[in-house]
């Protein structure tokens, strides 16, 4: 019974840590719109490189 409780507690605390990371990430992105623009630009660059590579083949 104690072992089961311990396992459940670990699972819950693991979930809490994961949830806090998600919340922190969301707040970080919300306060730093430059990061979102940077990610979008990076995505466009990567997509362009892939398209050029496919056209070259």
From Swiss-Prot:
GO terms for molecular function: metal ion binding; signaling receptor activator activity; signaling receptor binding. The record marks 12-13 as: Cleavage. Keywords: Amyloid, Cell membrane, Cell projection, Coated pit, Copper, Cytoplasm, Cytoplasmic vesicle, Endosome, Membrane, Metal-binding, Nucleus, Secreted, Transmembrane, Transmembrane helix, Zinc. It is found in: Cell membrane; Membrane; Perikaryon; Cell projection, Growth cone. Binds, via its C-terminus, to the PID domain of several cytoplasmic proteins, including APBB family members, the APBA family, MAPK8IP1, SHC1 and NUMB and DAB1. Binding to DAB1 inhibits its serine phosphorylation. Interacts (via NPXY motif) with DAB2 (via PID domain); the interaction is impaired by tyrosine phosphorylation of the NPXY motif. Also interacts with GPCR-like protein BPP, APPBP1, IB1, KNS2 (via its TPR domains), APPBP2 (via BaSS) and DDB1. In vitro, it binds MAPT via the MT-binding domains. Associates with microtubules in the presence of ATP and in a kinesin-dependent manner. Functions as a cell surface receptor and performs physiological functions on the surface of neurons relevant to neurite growth, neuronal adhesion and axonogenesis. Interaction between APP molecules on neighboring cells promotes synaptogenesis. Involved in cell mobility and transcription regulation through protein-protein interactions. Can promote transcription activation through binding to APBB1-KAT5 and inhibit Notch signaling through interaction with Numb. Couples to apoptosis-inducing pathways such as those mediated by G(o) and JIP. Inhibits G(o)-alpha ATPase activity. This is Amyloid-beta precursor protein. The lineage of its organism: Eukaryota, Metazoa, Chordata, Craniata, Vertebrata.
